[in-house]
UniProtKB/Swiss-Prot annotation:
The lineage of its organism: Archaea, Thermoproteota, Thermoprotei, Sulfolobales, Sulfolobaceae. GO terms for biological process: rRNA processing. Its EC number is 3.1.26.-. GO terms for molecular function: mRNA 3'-UTR AU-rich region binding; RNA endonuclease activity, producing 5'-phosphomonoesters. InterPro entries: DUF402, FomD-like_sf, Ntdp-like, RNA-bd_FAU-1. The keyword rRNA processing applies. Keywords: Endonuclease, Hydrolase, Nuclease, RNA-binding, rRNA processing. This is Probable ribonuclease FAU-1. Belongs to the FAU-1 family. The keyword rRNA processing applies. Pfam families: DUF402.
Amino acid sequence: MKGRVRIRGIYATALTSIFSSLSYEIVQQSVEIAERFMREVNNLPADITIKDFEYDRGKIIVMGNGTIEEDLHDVFKYSFHWKSPIKLYSVIEADESCTYGNFKVEPCLEEGIVIKPPYDGKIVLSETKAVSKYAMVWRGKGVTTFSEHINNEEERLRLLTLSSPLNRKGYNVKWRSNAKYATLNELKEDLERLVLRYENREFRDQGEDFYLITLSLPDKLHLDEVRKSIVNTVKYHHMLKLSYNREVDSLEKDKEGSPVKLLEALISDFMKIEHIKADGKAIYLRGGKVIEKEVNNDGYRITLRREINGNGVLDGIGKRIENGDYDIVEYNSDKWYQIHRYYSGIDNSLKGIYINISTPPELLKGKIRYLDLEIDIAIRDSEIIVLDEDELNKKSIYMHSSLVNKAKEVANYLIDCIQQNKLI
């Protein structure tokens, strides 16, 4: 076995199937997941945790130590992968300007433990602690606290028998969720090691890898197919779950259930546009009014009219933006690009075409979301201009080679279409 993995959240069924097939031992399953796979709940400590990102369930986080990185890239070939350059629970020292590397540090402690990696450009610290997969130990008021997942009173009393003696010596102990699944002897030895490490300041090897994966629609659809092999699953299950959790559960009680009504309900008169960059950061583009839509069991197509106001020039096209200019753009669940046709507000003449290459767009309530693949194409006065290919190569550190190759393949396809006057 490669390691013990705990999986939580809306992707749990599909990921349990996938990581089981990759020789990981699945532990701490919910009763529902154990029953689906006709197994007993495996109450053992986890080496790695995979779960929904609490701020956006369109992303997953992976935490722990093990050789999972390559498998993550292979499982999520068409998604963005961010690995923290600083390990979770590692001990770092901020400089005088309250930074560490290129990241701002908050609060500005001279030394502290990383409790939030810098996925938003900021490291959050807490006071220095010795950390294992079972517990945290540090000097303080001599109290014991528990993970929110340890809520059984009998279990808390069991753990208190071990931590109370340390509390009386002035050590704080926080029990992590894994502690529920270890023996008293394992936990006792672990606490002894943590105290020694804390007093000797041995933090060099402390910390856990942290990955943030922004899931694409193609990878969600793959997870749909995996889940479908285990339990009744409609197409777009994992996408729809982000907006309609209970409604999807209700729909799937009917084996002939169709996602069309839920897909239609996601489309409002005006749609926002969430344009996600390779490092996982979102840019919100000017949204647009829906002027045409088509939804069926196989997918969806939405055409927007976006009003373009302000000064400046149109990106890639180079023509000045004038009052009343507008963009007509189609988002198609089958296409890895969107064609923006920019028109003059004065005489409705075509000013130019800009093609954004991205993963196929997904729908959330009143919002279109896609992963931007950096490389784009502009058509200016019949000239074809390939934009930001160097950015694609630079940002490839966040992508599987399959996604990089797909972006270049789509760009070449579009160039051929333009040259043959077959752009649709």
